Amino acid sequence: MSTITKDQILEGVAALSVMEIVELISAMEEKFGVSAAAVAAGPAAAAEAVEEQTEFNVVLASFGDNKVAVIKAVRGATGLGLKEAKDLVESAPAVLKEGVNKDEAESLKKSLEEAGAAVEIK
């Protein structure tokens, strides 16, 4: 039995047509019990996990003991009228602002927590 080198294999594959390469890949998948598609999907999933979140939602979890102060803080932050702000606060948990940057979300959270609200950033 003669030994085939990697270079000889590469030259042989380079001489194949696209259809022949597809058939070769299928035969290799069957022979070795692997799937080429599963290997290709791995790095893409890892790249998505690395992305940092840039837009946040500020959620009023509860208004705590001082509902009036929280309503005032919500009005100041959102520009809503008194009735709309009151309805929003009373419907907690509720999204106050969507798609804001991290600094704005942190600032809004701080001002609402100072008024007595429980706030989450998602």
From Swiss-Prot:
Homodimer. Part of the ribosomal stalk of the 50S ribosomal subunit. Forms a multimeric L10(L12)X complex, where L10 forms an elongated spine to which 2 to 4 L12 dimers bind in a sequential fashion. Binds GTP-bound translation factors. GO terms for biological process: translation. It comes from Yersinia enterocolitica serotype O:8 / biotype 1B (strain NCTC 13174 / 8081). Signal peptide: none annotated. It comes from the Bacteria. The lineage of its organism: Bacteria, Pseudomonadati, Pseudomonadota, Gammaproteobacteria, Enterobacterales. Forms part of the ribosomal stalk which helps the ribosome interact with GTP-bound translation factors. Is thus essential for accurate translation. Keywords: Ribonucleoprotein, Ribosomal protein. CDD domains: Ribosomal_L7_L12. Belongs to the bacterial ribosomal protein bL12 family. GO terms for molecular function: mRNA binding; structural constituent of ribosome. This is Large ribosomal subunit protein bL12. InterPro entries: Ribosomal_bL12, Ribosomal_bL12_C, Ribosomal_bL12_C/ClpS-like, Ribosomal_bL12_oligo, Ribosomal_bL12_oligo_N_sf. GO terms for cellular component: cytosolic large ribosomal subunit. NCBIfam families: L12.
